[in-house]
Amino acid sequence: MPKKGNFKQKKKLRNRGRNVDPAVRDNLIQLIDIQDFRRDHLIEYLHVIQDKIGYIDEKHMTALADLLDISQTEVYEVATFYHHFDVITNGTSKPQSLTVRVCDSVSCQLNGADELIENLENYYKGTVRIQRVPCIGRCQSAPAATVKFNEVDKADLKKIKTIIDNKSFDPVIPDYIGMEEYIQDGGYELYSQIKTGKIKKESVVEELKNSNLRGLGGAGFPAGQKWEILMGQPQPRLFAINLDEGEPGTFKDRFYLESDPHRFLEGMLIASSVVEIDKIYIYLRDEYPAVRHILEKELSYLKDKFNNTIPDVELRRGAGAYICGEESAMICLLYTSPSPRDKRQSRMPSSA
């Protein structure tokens, strides 16, 4: 007999009783189209299912849990927490094949959102789902709506009907300063000088501290002090960038990302070089599909430009949860935690 306290504990059978439909499982593998499934990419996989099928049912969640080797409960908790996932369970019907999201936040309310919703509901009579949603960050062009991924400024029934009739569901990409134009105007010169040591990292931090630049998330924490604290942390060091702005009237991030994205990307690389970052996560709210398209494209160009010498960058997509603008909730989303927020005591804004 083994000595007391020296026995091996049986492996926990988390997935016992799971009935996986092989056809659904194979379909998900083809749909998601990757070799190695990652637990922390659960939300990304749920987005693929939602985008391509239009809803997420119990068979999808069971198969996804099997592919990730996690419990069905974990998948269900994550899928049902975020508003942009349509989860179908026993007793609930599938949503209409097309959804029009109409912002009913303050700016849009004042510019006719209620009338627009009424007109759409009267015209489509249940054949298209008309959904009231919180601020989508297009307050300057209220009332605003989205038809799948097509963002509609100064929306009215005629505009939305034309989009639906023409099946113009992709995001409309605005004109913006691309990488070559940005480089011709001196872009990435500062980053290159810091990376090669022509400009010392300590002098960058000192300049940042002297500028008194502060975070805009509410606490107003000095950016230079935050960088300095992080430089003293043990490695590996991870960089999480919060591009969520759900407050009505707030769309500063969308404005510069849709007009001058490389100014943001160079700032990201400067910070990563000074602080010696190992990996970067960009959390982008799901309400900005055009920005997502721009960043995916320009990040690819950026990696080629610097011969893959920049840190690994993961662009992560939100799913309609206002709370993820808060730092610990954002980090929980990056980990794909079923819990929307870390309820531990507040820490310095440079640690997680």
What are these model-predicted stretches?
Residues 1-58, 62-65, 72, 77, ...:
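Iron-sulfur (Fe-S) cluster-binding modules
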Residues 48, 53-132, 136, 281-314, ...:
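Small-residue-enriched alpha-helical segments and adjacent helix-cap loops
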Residues 98-100, 106-124, 140-164, 224-233:
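Iron-sulfur (Fe-S) cluster-binding segments and ferredoxin-like electron-carrier domains
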Residues 185-188, 242-253:
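Gly-rich Lys/Arg/Thr-decorated short loops/hinges at beta-loop-alpha junctions or inter-strand turns
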Residues 210-227, 321-330:
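Conserved phosphate/anionic-ligand binding catalytic regions in large, soluble enzymes, centered on
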Residues 261-273:
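Histidine-anchored nucleotide/phosphate-binding helix
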Residues 335-342:
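Conserved small/polar residues in nucleotide/adenosyl-binding loops
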Residues 346-352:
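Hydrophobic alpha-helical segments, chiefly the membrane-spanning helices
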